[in-house]
Amino acid sequence: MKQTLGAVPAARLTGTGPMSVAKQEADVQQAAAKPFIKGKFLTGSDIGLAVGIIIILTVLFLPVPAVVLDIGLAFSIAFSVLILMVALWIQRPLDFSAFPTVLLIATMMRLSLNIATTRVILTHGNEGYLAAGHVIHGFSQFVMGGDFVIGLVVFAILIIVNFLVITKGATRIAEVGARFTLDAIPGKQMAIDADLSSGLIDEKEAQRRRRELEEESSFFGSMDGASKFVRGDAIAGLIITAVNIFGGIVIGATRHGMDISQAADVFTKLSVGDGLVTQIPALIVSLAAGLLVSKGGTRGSADQAIFGQLGAYPKALLIAALLLFILGVMPGLPAFPFFLLGGAMAFVGIAVPRRQARQREADAAEAGKKQREAEEQERNSVKASLETNQIELCLGKQLSARLIASQEELAHRVNKMRRKFAQEYGFVIPEIKVTDDIALPPKSYRIKIHGTAVASHELRVGEILVVLGERPVPSVPGEEVREPAFGMRAYSVPETFTADLRREGYMTVDNLSVLLTHLSEIVRNNLAQLLSYKDMRILLDRLGPEYRKLLEDICPAHISYSGLQAVLKLLLAERISIRNLHLILEAIAEIAPLVRRPEMIVEHVRMRMAQQICGDLSDNGVLNVLRLGNRWDLVFHQSLKRDAKGEIVEFDIDPRLLEQFGTEASAAIRKHFDNGERFVLVSSPEARPYIRMIIERLFATLPVLSHVEIARGVEVKSLGAIS
């Protein structure tokens, strides 16, 4: 995964590679602990369910006051309505996979309340109609109208509807659904395996489908058994009501001295009221079970499925409306309800096609828009795949995970490095992409410029680096190595010896600093490649009005914009800042009418920039100089081939002399490099570019100046000569 560092003004390190994976794993572990604390010790949902079951069992055996019965019966009705609403709104049956368990709890709750009300009715029924509570009395008055015969009829109808219609149908649907689901499991499993083998789905999707298939078979199997709860509940309600009526009459007549008619009136009303209070929630739950099992494979909530499918055929609605109008004009039938319903159906039958037409147009427009967006996205993705990052830092798995703790510091220091480059060299380097690359060794990193690897190194995770130079090796255990940025002698030591090294006077460098120093030097060595044509035009657009006129005078009359870019690149290739762009343009304006080659133009520009060059390369106002000896100066001068006009056209040197020069120059330069000295190599103006090409292959960071590039007033300190 890729992460962008160094974006001005701020940078963030984000991604899904190993750097982000370790962080995500920590976040997951932290998040996993939170529900455990809140769910188990604060909300107490699991304890609440256990307490509820215990209360249900307690009601079976202990006498309950009428007030508590009222609360329990009201809760039973509310719980049943909640179950029905959930069954109506779920998108698919598996979304309510806990329904069998809920059904068992609801059935057990109603039976326990039934037993509790039976105990109260038989014990205190002689005290009057309010002996069993206000809920039972209210149902007996409201539903029965004060007549127990009406109550018996209504109760019988509820039992028949619940037992013979809803419950029996739901039971049959559950049986068939369970059988067909179990029979289809092998075929569905084979289909999942086939899709996985063909690559249509990945392993994660296959596991999800298998888990869903397992849940589906378990759900329908449970529903097949759970439907028996509803059926048994209806039978138990009928038997309990009959026992209440006959038992109440006997107890009232024999124990409480009531006459038969009075006992029959009181106990029948209370028993039938009790039966209605328990059978209505049972009917509601049976309806929810029927809705759930009859939903089948239909997607969406029940209202969406019903109204969507009934309203999908406008002709059927219009024909039904016509039939209602005909019934409305028939003699003896009331016209108003039939005309009202017929008009409503006719309105829906006419409005639905228009709405469907508008919806089809909107869908077609949306589909066209999505298709255009998909095509545009595909074109952009192809373009993006062709683009390469200008600067890319690839990290091995272990190294990227190790740097997670310092990602903010990494982003801050990269930002700081980009700002420093902008101030030092006069243009903003591109953003640096950080990539987790599992193909790299775990502790290694690789630096790419324009998609091409230019440097790599393996860090010692858990160790620090001591740059030695000419100093002896520290007394602590470690291993002598070369630091990657400059190739200087260094000593790698475990982090535990940091304090010991500081006591001995050694400066320590951590892995992040080693990496960023190496990255910084690689960027310096490739500044010319990083200055794009776009960057150059941005610099030119920032010029003031007076220098815009100068630019118009020289471009494109004497030098093209690409030629101007070549001059700037040649300067940056030798780490010469282009921040004084106006001075560069003035120098080009002086020489461009006379010469065309960028190599010749840049030598004149360097001479005009001598003050800046020496100022940037001097150390506390002193320019340390390593000269090219007279012998080698003569060799290089004789290797320059000129044409009739005296212009240099070729550099031809004997390979043996070139090899000898490389050996002698390396020895002299390495000596001063190991001492940590900052210096420049000085040669003749004509040979300077060619000597620079040779030295660059040996010491890329060593500046090579000509005699004319040493500005007046600069204090020069000679370090000797290559002779």
Curated annotation (Swiss-Prot):
Q: Where is the composition biased (Basic and acidic residues)?
A: 361-381
Localization in the cell: Cell membrane
Q: Would you identify the family this protein belongs to, as annotated? A: Belongs to the FHIPEP (flagella/HR/invasion proteins export pore) family.
Record's protein name: Flagellar biosynthesis protein FlhA
Tell me the function of this protein. Answer: Required for formation of the rod structure of the flagellar apparatus. May constitute the export apparatus of flagellin. The flagellum is required to cause a persistent disease in a murine model of infection.
Task: State the species of origin.
Answer: Brucella melitensis biotype 1 (strain ATCC 23456 / CCUG 17765 / NCTC 10094 / 16M)
Lineage at the top is: Bacteria, Pseudomonadati, Pseudomonadota, Alphaproteobacteria, Hyphomicrobiales
Does the entry feature the keyword Cell membrane, yes or no?
yes
A GO BP annotation: protein secretion
Residues crossing the lipid bilayer are: 49-69, 71-91, 96-116, 146-166, 234-254, 272-292, 316-336
Gene assigned in the entry: flhA
* Gene3D superfamilies, alphabetized: FHIPEP family, domain 1, FHIPEP family, domain 3, FHIPEP family, domain 4
